[in-house]
């Protein structure tokens, strides 16, 4: 699915991402801090009713709590890291009642951007601070707080670019000289406060309040003068100029309150929740692109002066959203107790005040550990999922006198997806080394789709329900100790996703037909202090079309994606048993 079709949760609270980001160069640090993560749950389909109204996948992150073991009263841990791409610092403190994690991260990818075809002054600076405080005064009460501040700056002053393309017999050269600059800023605040009361050992009630605020601006004025030449003959094929301008400003604020009631019995885990959200988004955007070819502004009709692209948007969204779900996890065995079953079933309901739409989403999944093998797990899931619109999906465009105006379509409906999932999991040993093989096949019937195009990481929607389609595939993964004491894995995926738009079959922008990934770790001979990690990736290219064109022109496909990463680490201190030792004894 697209970026907006995947839900991300941190400690039961949904996380949002910036709305104006258009390129990977502008993207900063992930909202998920890897130093603070305890558990990760991910599902590509057939997920439970407690996960929100997204129709592709759900990522559930739980931050860790530090607690001393045994007779210790406190425990601390920390990390310092530095590289050509930035620096990180993390510190955690834990007592019997309190756990406090703090992390600050800084990233700059100017070193990598300097290797691209476009020679420029890249000054991206991304700063992120996160804190997680958990306090348990007694066994009945728990208070959690998560705070996050993210300040991302992207400054770009291009100089020139030269690209060659064509065949061996017909090589062409494209040169551009630039004037101007780009200045962007994405400032985000996120916070959540949760209070949990354990009514009994089997029943708990939680209240969570969260706030998300984002202030974004994207400003650029860049002129490019280009030459297109035939390389072999040095013949000039064309000259021209283009000018790109943007003044985009956006402010987003989402406040939410959530109540969760959980109750456990011998065979059932029942969970019910209600969420109320208040959303406010304001946008003021102006973009245009002028192209001059041989002294004529394109497009040229001999009468009026038009831009190749011009867009204006001044929109405000004020809406309330209500969500509720009820789910139960029922565990039982067959007669004789040889086969074990886990049945999760539930229903999710949501209502949005903007389009007056009420959605019901039933979901069910069944996990089976068959009698013939306790190392085998079978999983089947099905459900009806909706992609509740947020902001970008609402933006509908109309063109008047060569100018495109973006307005909000308040009558839009939620796209839907019907999931059918079948999975297989088998754990085994070879030479007393652990291995795990998983396979999953899925089919998703898509309806009421809002078509969208992707340019880099910017997603632009049509603003109307105009298509239907499907997504299908199979994922295979082998995980295990290829080398004793290390973890490695190999994955292989086959995928296909298409939609029917205006009577024509069109691949969705996410139609990546295959992918192969390998992660391998090994020790250096004679020592376990030195460790090497190797990661290889090969994936099919994604479909694309020329800018500002209809999706029906998605006739191009990018080359296959290839990547190799290698890393090495050396363990200075070996204190895995937790005993106090001299630092020098550990090193030498």
What are these regions (language model features)?
Residues 252-254, 267, 275, 312-444, ...:
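Structural signature of Gram-negative outer-membrane beta-barrels, strongest in the C-terminal barrel
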Residues 136-152, 181-355, 438-441, 489:
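Face-selective signature of the C-terminal outer-membrane beta-barrel domain
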Residues 9, 24-30, 45, 50-77:
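N-terminal periplasmic accessory domains that precede
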Residues 206-210, 411-465, 470, 588:
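Membrane-embedded beta-barrel scaffold of Gram-negative outer-membrane proteins
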Residues 336-337, 442-445, 462-545:
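Gram-negative outer-membrane beta-barrel transporters
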Residues 92, 134, 418-420, 494, ...:
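Conserved C-terminal beta-signal and adjacent last beta-strands/turns
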Residues 68, 94-184, 220, 448:
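Periplasmic-side early beta-strands and strand-to-turn transitions of outer-membrane beta-barrels
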Residues 14-42:
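Short acidic/polar hinge/loop motifs at secondary-structure boundaries
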């Amino acid at each position: 699915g697209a970026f907006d079709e995947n839900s991300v949760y941190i400690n039961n609270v949904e996380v949002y991402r910036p709305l104006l980001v258009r390129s990977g160069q502008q993207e900063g640090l992930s909202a998920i801090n890897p130093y603070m993560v305890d558990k990760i749950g991910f599902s590509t389909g057939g997920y439970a009713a407690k996960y929100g109204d997204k129709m592709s996948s759900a990522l559930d992150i739980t931050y860790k709590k530090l607690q001393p073991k045994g007779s210790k009263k406190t425990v601390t841990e920390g990390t310092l890291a530095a590289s050509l791409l930035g620096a990180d610092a993390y510190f955690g403190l834990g007592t019997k009642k309190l756990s406090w994690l703090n992390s600050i991260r800084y990233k700059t990818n100017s070193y990598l951007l300097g290797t691209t075809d476009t020679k420029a002054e890249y000054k991206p600076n991304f700063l992120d601070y996160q804190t997680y405080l958990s306090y348990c005064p007694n066994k009945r009460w728990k208070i959690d707080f998560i705070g996050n501040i993210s300040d991302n700056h992207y400054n770009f002053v291009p100089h020139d670019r030269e690209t060659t393309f064509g065949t061996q017999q017909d090589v062409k050269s494209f040169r551009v000289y630039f004037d101007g600059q780009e200045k962007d800023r994405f400032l985000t605040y996120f916070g959540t406060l949760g209070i949990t009361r354990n009514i009994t050992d089997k029943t708990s009630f939680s209240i969570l309040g969260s706030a998300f605020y984002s202030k974004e601006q994207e400003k650029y004025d860049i002129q490019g003068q280009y030459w297109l030449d035939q390389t072999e003959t040095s013949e000039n094929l064309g000259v021209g100029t283009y000018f790109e301008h943007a003044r985009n400003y956006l402010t987003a604020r989402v406040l939410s309150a959530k109540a969760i009631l959980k109750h456990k019995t011998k065979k059932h885990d029942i969970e019910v929740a209600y969420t109320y959200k208040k959303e406010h988004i304001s946008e003021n955007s102006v973009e245009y692109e002028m192209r001059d070819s041989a002294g004529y502004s394109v497009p040229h009709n001999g009468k009026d002066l038009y831009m190749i692209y011009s867009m204006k948007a001044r929109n405000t969204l004020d809406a309330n959203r209500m969500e509720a779900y009820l789910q139960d996890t029922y565990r039982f065995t067959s007669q004789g107790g040889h086969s074990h079953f886990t049945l999760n079933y539930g229903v999710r309901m949501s209502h949005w005040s903007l389009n007056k739409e009420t959605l019901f989403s039933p979901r069910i999944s069944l996990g089976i550990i068959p009698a013939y093998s306790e190392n085998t797990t079978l999983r089947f899931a099905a459900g009806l999922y909706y992609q509740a619109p947020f902001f970008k999906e609402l933006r509908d465009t109309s063109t008047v006198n060569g100018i495109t105006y973006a307005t909000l379509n308040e009558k839009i409906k939620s796209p839907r997806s019907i999931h059918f999932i079948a999975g297989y999991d088998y754990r085994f040993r070879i030479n007393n080394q652990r291995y795990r093989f998983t396979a999953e096949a899925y089919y998703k019937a898509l309806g009421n789709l809002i078509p969208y195009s992707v340019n880099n990481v910017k997603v632009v929607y049509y603003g109307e329900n105009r298509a239907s389609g499907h997504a299908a595939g199979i994922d295979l993964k082998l995980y295990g100790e290829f080398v004793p004491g290390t973890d490695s894995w190999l994955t292989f995926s086959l995928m296909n996703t298409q939609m029917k738009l205006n009577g024509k079959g069109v691949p969705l922008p996410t139609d990546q037909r295959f992918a192969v990934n390998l992660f391998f770790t090994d020790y250096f001979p004679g020592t376990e202090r030195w460790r090497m990690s190797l990661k290889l990736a090969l994936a099919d290219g994604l479909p694309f079309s020329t800018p500002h064109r209809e999706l029906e022109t998605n006739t191009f496909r990018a080359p296959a994606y290839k990547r190799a990463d290698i890393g090495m680490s050396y363990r200075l201190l070996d204190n895995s048993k937790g005993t106090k030792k001299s630092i020098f004894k550990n090193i030498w």
